[in-house]
Amino acid sequence: MSLLQKIPRKVWRFLDIINRLIKKDKESIFIYSNLGFRDNIKAIFDYLIENKYNSEFRITVSLNNYEEYEKTYQNLNIPNIKFVSNLKGVFSFFRCKYCFYCFGKYPIKPAPGQVVFNLWHGMPLKRIGNMVKGCEKVNYNYFTHLLCTSEFFRDIMKKSFNCSDNEIVICGQPRTDNMLNSQAPVKEREIKARIISFNERKNKMILWLPTFREKSADEFDILSKEQLESLNQMCINRKYTVVIKPHPLSSFKAEDFNDYKGIKIITDQRLDSLGINFYSVIRYSECLITDYS
């Protein structure tokens, strides 16, 4: 449990009052995540930088792993960008006019005139939020806007977060822009050379995204060791490569697959170190294997 999660609700209620009292800076943007710098908040950040919003706005990024990015972006000499811890981020949240998150949140009610956008991280195929049994009375609404990808999900998201029609914004997920962008900066063979190998860069890529399970032993239980070996050999013979990206909360060990030439493991950390957007990988895969999460 993080330090922020240990703070009693009574303290957060006091911070609601503090947030209402502090004047907001109209030239500041705040981005928050407690599960790494990725997904919709990374897509929003990249868009802001690519379109030079940082020339008009000061952008603060609050992350659980902010140290990994602080020096990197300092070396890039991008102006008006600051990375802080989630604890220090509270003070930036108080001052910022525009706020975005998709993982975690500060359970602080937005101040009048403050824009807090919950981008979430996908449309639910299972119960979430207030629709989960036993969570009907939990307050998940700490935003002014909630992203919803279509009218089909409007009522589901409203019930899940106990919000109104006025708070729903129908829009695509920012993260998928890279998957659909025909002008994607990283080309297919370059991506394959980085995440598979240079020699196998012409292979067709099958992307496997297993869902998160409470028991790590269950994540790949659909294939026995013998079946994995058979799949590996089939891929080698047919010039395919199966790329498995585990769920970010997964605890399985990538080194268990080192002996399989036709099966590769890629993690969010590895993609980040290679400078590859995950949705570019989806764009260039021949086939996607997954289940709902």
Where in this protein do the model-derived segments appear?
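Short boundary motifs at domain starts and secondary-structure transition points
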Residues: L15-D25, I108-K109, R194-E200
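Short, surface-exposed amphipathic charged segments that create phosphate/polyanion-binding patches used
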Residues: C96-Y101, S182-E190, F278-R283
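A short, charged/proline- and glycine-enriched loop
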Residues: L21-F30, G113-Q114, R201-K204, R238
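Active-site and donor-binding regions of nucleotide-sugar-utilizing enzymes
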Residues: I29-N181
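Conserved catalytic-core segment of nucleotide-activated headgroup transferases in glycan assembly
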Residues: F37-I44, E50-K52, R175-D259
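Membrane-proximal basic amphipathic "stem/tether" segments
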Residues: M1-N34
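Donor nucleotide-activated moiety binding/catalytic core segment of transferases
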Residues: F83-C96, P248-S293
